[in-house]
């Protein structure tokens, strides 16, 4: 009542556990009947539970609710372990390693939570979430870092992105993936389903990886092809960062 009278919202969205769906259905109906706000302006954005390997809602060892700070700490520890496994830790300083670990941990948790259909439950698996392979946040992060490095090296060599032309099936697949961004963004918003956008950026990263494996990019001797592929890389990076 206070929010309606004080804020005068056009729409109110309640992002709460899907198990509360019946409760909100009743609350919204009561609010409509009381003349506070019509039901079509009230929406429950339900989400599934984060479960342990036993299939039950994830909790601390003591049985309490796990706080976000605890999740961040756990993800950071796993990310640091992952970086150590890559052999990267020996090439960078302690401060840079900590910065990269924080980025990896954040990407892992965010993507893991948003990639699922919002109302479904999922198992909390940090080993999988922090992997640099597969459908994970670190995989997308790695693709972005690789593109930035590629564009930077091209710039240092005097090469710039240019007009895009399609000369192969891998390039065609990448262009088609890029073309889906606007629709993915629109559908993700309209349906209140972030996983749609997550699916798009993952597909895009896969398409870029296929291009990277199939063709030279910065080292392409044909100038038109080189500038085209650099242009594709620039477009991919833009969508990965926006997504």
Describe the residue ranges of each PLM region.
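Non-catalytic interaction-recognition regions
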Residues: 1-243
């Amino acid at each position: 009542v206070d929010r309606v009278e004080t804020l005068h919202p056009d729409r109110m969205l309640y992002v709460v556990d899907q198990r509360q769906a019946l409760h909100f259905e009743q609350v919204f109906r009561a609010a409509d009947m009381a003349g506070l706000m019509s039901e079509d302006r009230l929406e429950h954005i339900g989400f599934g539970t984060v479960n342990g390997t036993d299939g039950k809602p994830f909790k601390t060892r003591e049985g309490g609710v796990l706080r976000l700070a605890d999740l961040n700490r756990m993800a950071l520890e796993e990310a640091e372990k992952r970086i150590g496994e890559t052999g990267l830790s020996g090439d960078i300083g302690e401060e840079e390693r900590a910065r990269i670990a924080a980025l990896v941990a954040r990407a892992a948790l965010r993507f893991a939570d948003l990639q699922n259909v919002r109302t479904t439950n999922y198992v909390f698996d940090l080993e999988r979430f922090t992997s640099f392979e597969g459908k994970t946040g670190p995989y997308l992060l790695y693709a972005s870092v690789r593109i930035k490095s590629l564009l930077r090296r091209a710039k240092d060599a005097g090469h710039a992105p240019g007009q895009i032309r399609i000369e192969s099936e891998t390039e065609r697949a990448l262009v088609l993936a890029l073309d889906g961004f606007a629709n993915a963004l629109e559908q993700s918003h309209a349906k209140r389903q972030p996983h749609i956008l997550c699916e798009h950026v993952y597909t895009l990263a896969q398409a870029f990886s296929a291009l990277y494996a199939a063709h030279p990019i910065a080292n392409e001797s044909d100038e038109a092809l080189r500038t085209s592929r650099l242009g594709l890389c620039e477009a991919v990076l833009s969508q990965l960062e926006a997504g």
